[in-house]
């Protein structure tokens, strides 16, 4: 277990570990307990009742948060011809084809999201071992393999985030900054949870939402009352 600093331990004392907080109360506490000198990211960890080893229990998708995440995301688009021009006009940070495939193969990774037109996926697929483990591989499930590149870029820039269950059955997602008003954090949180509930795989058995914890980058985890989230 990592050793926590004095400020973290002081903040952790103010969290009732036996309590399931309502979302607004939890986010108020996250803001109150933030002690870092930078605008911390507010993160949500959702424990799901799925076994990700089974193909019919995968949870992956994307959702546009109404208030964004507070982070400007760099978008790389793999496209050619008219679609490349469309991507540039829509505000993509990088647009190209083979030259960027070569660059990534050599270790360049200065981007947050990758979008590709379907005709480029044969070439982009060669980067699977590099982009896959980083969660950057384009996918039709998250709307990042598409000919509608302008729409994809607009959604990403507006606050579209991707979610994916990890090997432990947990989804980790940033939903804003500590500087956000509580109301905006709650609205982003509700949007995410609605998307996760709708994404429940057919193969999931038993209780689907097993636990929800929120925290700031440096702060302690606060448990949210997940039992009220399932309508």
Curated annotation (Swiss-Prot):
According to the record, the signal peptide region is none
User: From what organism does this protein derive?
Assistant: Carboxydothermus hydrogenoformans (strain ATCC BAA-161 / DSM 6008 / Z-2901)
Task: Give the family per the record.
Answer: Belongs to the universal ribosomal protein uL1 family.
Name the InterPro entries on file: Ribosom_uL1_bac-type, Ribosomal_uL1, Ribosomal_uL1-like, Ribosomal_uL1/biogenesis, Ribosomal_uL1_3-a/b-sand, Ribosomal_uL1_CS
Which Pfam families does the annotation name? Ribosomal_L1 (PF00687)
Domain of life, per lineage: Bacteria
Q: Name one GO cellular component term.
A: large ribosomal subunit
Indicate what this protein is called per its UniProt record: Large ribosomal subunit protein uL1
Summarizing the function annotation, the protein's role is: Binds directly to 23S rRNA. The L1 stalk is quite mobile in the ribosome, and is involved in E site tRNA release.
Q: Which UniProt keywords apply?
A: Repressor, Ribonucleoprotein, Ribosomal protein, RNA-binding, rRNA-binding, Translation regulation, tRNA-binding
Q: Quote one Gene Ontology molecular function term.
A: structural constituent of ribosome
């Amino acid at each position: 277990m990592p050793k926590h600093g004095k400020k973290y331990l002081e903040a952790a004392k103010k969290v009732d570990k036996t309590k399931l907080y309502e979302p607004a109360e939890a986010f108020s506490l996250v803001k109150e307990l933030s002690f870092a000198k930078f605008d911390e990211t507010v993160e949500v960890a959702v424990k799901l009742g799925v076994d990700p080893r089974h193909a019919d229990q995968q949870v992956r998708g994307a959702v546009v948060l109404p208030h964004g995440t507070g982070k400007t995301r760099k978008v790389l688009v793999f496209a050619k011809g008219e679609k490349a021009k469309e991507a540039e006009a829509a505000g993509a940070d990088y647009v190209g084809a083979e030259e960027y495939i070569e660059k990534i193969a050599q270790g360049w990774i200065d981007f947050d999201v990758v979008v590709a037109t379907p005709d480029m996926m044969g070439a982009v697929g060669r980067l699977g071992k590099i982009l896959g483990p980083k969660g950057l591989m384009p996918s039709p499930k998250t709307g990042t393999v598409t000919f509608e590149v302008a729409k994809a870029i607009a959604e990403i820039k507006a606050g579209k985030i991707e979610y994916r269950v990890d090997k432990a059955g947990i989804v980790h997602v940033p939903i804003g900054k500590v500087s956000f008003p509580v109301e905006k954090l709650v609205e982003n949180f509700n949007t995410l949870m609605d998307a996760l509930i709708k994404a429940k795989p057919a193969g999931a058995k038993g209780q689907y939402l097993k636990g929800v914890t929120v925290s700031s980058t440096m702060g302690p985890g606060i448990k949210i009352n997940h039992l009220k989230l399932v309508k």
